[in-house]
């Protein structure tokens, strides 16, 4: 599935969203927010303040206390945008006994449009075209994450950093319009971090996709993001230009 090419239509729209367990004391209140194609938004702030819960809410896995979440024109969670949203959670959800390639193929299958460019072709030809495109996406994503030599290895034999690269490759193979990533750069050495960040950033910019990333390291967040949102008890952090504070219940 290809990313949208219309830069004037937001990929993500949040309106009056509050998350938490009690409507009277929400964990996080989010101002109205629109994320457009090509934008990378980082969310930073202290641990335990709702960053991951906010990401899960955008993914449609958690209902907000109030407000609405719209992804690619679909109101969540009632109408999830199948294939358009890629999610890299902290708990990666990889199939540990299966190979790197198998796990990345799962992402490619999730994003495949079986009609796509082959509308005029016969059904067997269409399926062959889809299969070839899916394989190409998997191979490319594995190469971008520098996992080619590990493609046949089972996940359980990989290091934590390598597993995070597999999860990232799985999402890139899906080719979503919106990527949600929760601390996806953790456990990576500096050299690997740089190459992973470059691959993901290139995908977002070249495909006109969008990305929301949770990152505890503010310096790293500033390095990757076009905009930085800070969860910090509703106070705007003055040394970060152009940020918008999210109101958080202490």
What is the predicted role of each segment?
Residues 67-83:
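Conserved ABC transporter NBD signature motif
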Residues 117-150:
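Conserved ABC ATPase "signature" region
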Residues 168:
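Hydrophobic anchor residue at the start of the ABC signature
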Residues 179-182:
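Catalytic Walker B motif of ABC-type/P-loop ATPase nucleotide-binding domains
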Residues 215-216:
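H-loop/switch region of ABC-family ATPase nucleotide-binding domains
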């Amino acid at each position: 599935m290809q990313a949208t090419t219309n830069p004037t239509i937001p990929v993500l729209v949040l309106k009056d969203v509050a998350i938490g367990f009690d409507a009277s004391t929400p964990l996080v209140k989010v101002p109205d927010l629109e994320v457009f194609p090509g934008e990378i938004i980082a969310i930073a702030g202290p641990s335990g303040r709702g960053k991951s819960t906010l990401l899960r809410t955008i993914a449609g896995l958690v209902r907000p206390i109030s407000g609405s979440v719209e992804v690619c024109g679909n109101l969540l969670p009632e109408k999830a945008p199948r294939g358009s949203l890629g999610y890299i959670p902290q708990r990666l959800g990889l199939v540990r006994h299966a190979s790197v390639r198998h796990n990345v193929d799962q992402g490619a299958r999730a994003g495949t449009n079986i009609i796509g460019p082959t509308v005029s072709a016969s059904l067997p030809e269409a399926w062959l075209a889809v299969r070839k495109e899916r394989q190409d996406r998997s191979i490319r994503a594995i190469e971008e994450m520098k996992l080619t030599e590990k493609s046949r290895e089972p996940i359980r034999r990989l290091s934590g950093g390598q597993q995070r690269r597999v999860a990232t490759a799985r999402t890139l193979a899906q080719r979503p319009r919106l990527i949600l990533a929760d601390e996806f750069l953790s456990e990576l050495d500096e050299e690997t971090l740089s190459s992973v960040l470059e691959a993901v950033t290139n995908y977002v910019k070249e495909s006109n996709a969008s990305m929301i990333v949770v990152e505890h390291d503010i310096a790293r967040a500033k390095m990757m993001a076009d905009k930085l949102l800070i969860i910090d008890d509703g106070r705007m952090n003055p040394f970060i230009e152009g940020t918008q504070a999210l109101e958080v219940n202490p």
